[in-house]
Amino acid sequence: VEPLGIEGEGVEFISTDAHGNQNYYQCKASNTTHSSWAMSDLQHHDVFNRSKKHIESGDQKYYYFISPLQYGELDELCKRARTNSSAQDFLTYQINNPKIKAVFSECEKHYSLDRNNSQELKNLIYILAHCYFEHYSIGEEERRDLEGRIGTIFTGKTSTIRNLLEQYANDTGSF
């Protein structure tokens, strides 16, 4: 169920983890007839404005966009933003190939932030570091893989255990 009000705009659900982090989840199973997400598709769905708004609304806010479709280099850019020591190091060492540079420039445009302004650059990196563009495969192979992992932890019929775990997660909101 999508949360009501301003906080629920552009998200399927919100969770708070044990560390007090508030996680906003947007899930999209498809992108019309496209087999991946282009930056323009995400812009069309207002993902950049919504993620920025949620992340900037307070400390410990994270935005997750989850889909079985690929994102190009966007998820890699966000991972790199989480592993830098300074804004200048990020530009020098993490934005180091043409594809990543192009995606970074698109993010700069879509988030309406300017890398030449040191405070806006820090804000852009902060937003990217708090965004997760997760690729989640669906299908029979993934189900078998998940049940294989379950079999290494639990004893019993793995499909039954998977169903019980899914039911528990849905009933308690523990994701």
What does each of the following model-derived ranges do?
Residues 1-49:
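Catalytic centers of nucleases
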Residues 28-175:
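Acidic metal-coordinating catalytic centers involved in nucleic-acid phosphodiester chemistry
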